[in-house]
Swiss-Prot record:
Mg(2+) binds at D353. The active site is at H312 (proton donor). Belongs to the cyclic nucleotide phosphodiesterase family. PDE9 subfamily. Residues 236-557 form the PDEase domain. The keyword Phosphoprotein applies. It is found in: Cell projection, Ruffle membrane; Cytoplasm, Perinuclear region; Golgi apparatus; Endoplasmic reticulum. The lineage of its organism: Eukaryota, Metazoa, Chordata, Craniata, Vertebrata. This is High affinity cGMP-specific 3',5'-cyclic phosphodiesterase 9A. Specifically hydrolyzes the second messenger cGMP, which is a key regulator of many important physiological processes. Highly specific: compared to other members of the cyclic nucleotide phosphodiesterase family, has the highest affinity and selectivity for cGMP. Specifically regulates natriuretic-peptide-dependent cGMP signaling in heart, acting as a regulator of cardiac hypertrophy in myocytes and muscle. Does not regulate nitric oxide-dependent cGMP in heart.
């Protein structure tokens, strides 16, 4: 604004008129002729007089808009040179031109203003006649205004017009500044909206990435349920699933009842047939009037809602359900459990990890995922597994409990929720302590005791891989570590805490399993052995052997690391000696030279 206003600043020139200082102000838009006329008016000379300006040291000054400004102490002297004789036509033409220029927006840009003389005095003798003083007051009617008076009036009018013009210019500048501020405020507002939009886009991109990862890791089935989309509903197939009904051999049926069953030998369709066989073999289809076609649809829909994670996938679901099935036969659970309890145990085992995303509860809570927010950080995955299970069962085509009375369904629902939530390892110590208290006086007729026992049973089945033979159990360790590493890599990239047992730079297969077997698996199965002694030989003995095997593997790993350190130390020492020899040789060569 400062530079803008300075462009309209007029120039002031001080004239010495016979000892009287006259200040003349004119705009930079005036031309030389206009400035000369203004000086003539100021000195009282006719307008057509040619004058010259002299400095205090009698140097001539060019009369034009770029002439140097002076001060009261160094005024210019005005010296008339000649008077121009103009014809009437030329004078009229100049007058007309002057009248037209007065109509311009800046009101005859020539004259800005005059100041009254500060000091009075006489003109130098021998020069032009002094200008007569005008009488006070207005002219009488009919009296012609003298040219000098007319010029003075024109000058005053020009000054007033210039002031008005400047005022209008200031208003225009104010309006321009106001408009500029409005534009800036609008830009600030738009930038703020952009920030909000960017954050929303980041959130949408994150959701899209998770959805794409979920889609790529799962089979293409119309009955998908994703926790990323609340509006997606299950649309189970209304036709009979097309997987073939395998006729299981007696050897397979016998092996299926044992914990040593090799779960890696079977394709998904074969595993579905095995699960279907379990429901028939345990009498659940008969006792609860389950429609065989509905059972197949339900199993197929469950299969399609397990993701293709390295560990938490449909094969893991089958592994847990098969271990539960084998424990029913090994421990003769049907002698002390009702068929309703067996149905709850088997169905909860099948549904316990539905739609598992491959990232555990710790990640869900630290990353503040939708599941953690929805379930308030309380077992978000286990709550989600329950929700998906009952959303599938809510579809008539998949409701295997459709012929069970409402009270019975309520009991099944409550039992399944209790068991699936018990698979959260964060509750392991709490559940174990409660079960140990009840073990002293365990009562099969006590509902609380039975509920705790069922919770322990599903926990045993969920983490029972090391109970199986080494060739069956060991691949599961690789799968679990792969899923752990996938999570820890993502946690590192997102700046989240990383558990040491998941960090690929810190954990090995041996270190990952030794602590888990010694402090989680063995104590839990030892507690179960007190109720079911037959578990010791079939399940506890393999755990002891597995612990010993991994401890031996750890000793080998430690020995290899120690050997590697020694090798590295020797290599570095040899390298240093070689460098010393090279330096000695160079020094000796230098001495010889």
């Amino acid at each position: 604004m400062g530079s803008g206003s300075s462009s309209y600043r007029p120039k002031a020139i001080y004239l010495d008129i016979d000892g009287r200082i006259q200040k003349v102000i004119f705009s930079k838009y005036c031309n030389s002729s206009d400035i000369m006329d203004l000086f003539c008016i100021a000195t009282g000379l006719p307008r057509n007089t040619t004058i010259s300006l002299l400095t205090t040291d009698d140097a001539m000054v060019s009369i034009d808009p770029t002439m140097p400004a002076n001060s009261e102490r160094t005024p210019y002297k005005v010296r008339p040179v000649a008077i121009k004789q103009l014809s009437a036509g030329v004078e009229d033409k100049r007058t007309t031109s002057r009248g037209q220029s007065a109509e311009r927006p800046l009101r005859d840009r020539r004259v800005v203003g005059l100041e009254q003389p500060r000091r009075e005095g006489a003109f130098e003798s021998g020069q032009v006649e002094p200008r007569p003083r005008e009488p006070q007051g207005c002219c009488q009617e009919g009296q012609r205004i003298p040219p000098e008076r007319e010029e003075l009036i024109q000058s005053v009018l020009a000054q007033v017009a210039e002031q008005f013009s400047r005022a209008f210019k200031i208003n225009e500048l104010k309006a321009e500044v106001a408009n500029h501020l409005a534009v800036l405020e609008k830009r600030v507002e738009l930038e703020g909206l952009k920030v909000v939009e960017i954050e929303k886009c980041k959130s949408d991109i994150k959701k899209m990435r998770e959805e794409l990862a979920a889609r790529s890791s799962r089979t293409n089935c119309p009955c998908k349920y994703s926790f990323l989309d609340n509006h997606k509903k299950l649309t189970p197939r209304r036709d009979v699933p097309t997987y073939p009904k395998y006729l299981l051999s007696p050897e397979t049926i016998e092996a299926l009842r044992k914990p040593t069953f090799d779960v890696w030998l079977w394709e998904p369709n074969e595993m579905l047939s095995c699960l279907e066989h379990m429901y028939h073999d345990l009498g659940l289809v008969r006792d609860f009037s389950i429609n065989p076609v509905t059972l197949r649809r339900w199993l197929f829909c469950v299969h399609d809602n397990y993701r293709n994670n390295p560990f938490h996938n449909f094969r893991h679901c089958f592994c847990v359900a098969q271990m539960m099935y084998s424990m029913v036969w090994l421990c003769s659970l049907q002698e002390n459990f009702s068929q309703m309890d067996i149905l709850i145990l088997m169905t909860a085992a099948i549904c316990h990890d539905l739609d598992h995303p491959g990232y555990n509860n710790t990640y869900q809570i630290n990353a503040r995922t939708e599941l953690a927010v929805r379930y308030n950080d309380i077992s978000p995955l286990e709550n989600h597994h329950c929700a998906v299970a009952f959303q599938i069962l809510a579809e008539p085509e998949c409701n295997i409990f459709s012929n069970i009375p409402p009270d019975g369904f309520k009991q099944i629902r409550q039992g399944m929720i209790t068991l699936i939530l018990a698979t959260d390892m964060a509750r392991h110590a709490e559940i174990m302590d409660s079960f140990k208290e009840k073990m002293e006086n365990f009562d099969y007729s006590n509902e609380e005791h039975m509920t705790l026992l069922k919770m322990i049973l599903i926990k045993c089945c969920d983490i029972s891989n090391e109970v199986r033979p080494m060739e069956v159990a060991e691949p599961w360790v690789d799968c679990l570590l792969e899923e752990y590493f996938m999570q820890s890599d993502r946690e590192k990239s997102e700046g989240l805490p990383v558990a040491p047992f998941m960090d690929r730079d810190k954990v090995t297969k041996a270190t990952a399993q030794i602590g888990f077997i010694k402090f989680v698996l063995i104590p839990m199965f030892e507690t179960v052995t007190k109720l079911f002694p037959m578990v010791e030989e079939i399940m506890l003995q393999p755990l002891w052997e597995s612990r010993d095997r991994y401890e031996e593997l750890k000793r080998i790993d430690d020995a290899m690391k120690e050997l590697q350190k020694k090798t590295d130390s020797l290599t570095s020492g040899a390298t240093e000696k070689s460098r010393e020899r090279s330096r000695d040789v160079k020094n000796s060569e230098g001495d010889c030279a």
